[in-house]
Amino acid sequence: MSRVKRGVTARARHKKVLDQAKGYRGRRKNVYRIAKQAVMKAGQYAYRDRRQRKRQFRALWIARINAAAREVGLTYSTFMNGLKKAAIEVDRKVLADLAVFDKPAFAALADQARAKLAA
């Protein structure tokens, strides 16, 4: 049985971690043991925040829709209820975009929602 020397694989593993830690401050960028922990924590934050980003954007869209709906005399919940009754299936991302960049189109949707709520 021949002897296995680990120098090449260890160096490759260390290099991989230190490359991932590029741009970090202090010893986190050039000390393997500390960089490894920093890279692992960064990965945990990235995993968590990829999920939180979806929640945060949905909350932002709802806040924008609510603000625009109140400008035309509705609340968010009544506006969304009116759209549902009018069978208008526009997602919150598009509604928020209309609320910010195309106010007349948003007002037209609000009028349709209001008409269905009154009926």
Curated annotation (Swiss-Prot):
Residues in coiled coil: none
Region forming the signal peptide: none
GO biological process, one term: translation
GO cellular component: ribonucleoprotein complex; ribosome
Keywords for the protein's UniProt record, in alphabetical order: Ribonucleoprotein, Ribosomal protein, RNA-binding, rRNA-binding
An example molecular function term from Gene Ontology annotations: structural constituent of ribosome
Name of a matching Pfam family: Ribosomal_L20
CDD domains recorded: Ribosomal_L20 (cd07026)
Xref: PANTHER family: 39S RIBOSOMAL PROTEIN L20
Family: Belongs to the bacterial ribosomal protein bL20 family.
Stated role: Binds directly to 23S ribosomal RNA and is necessary for the in vitro assembly process of the 50S ribosomal subunit. It is not involved in the protein synthesizing functions of that subunit.
NCBIfam families: rplT_bact
Name the UniProt record assigns to this protein: Large ribosomal subunit protein bL20
Organism name: Aromatoleum aromaticum (strain DSM 19018 / LMG 30748 / EbN1) (Azoarcus sp. (strain EbN1))
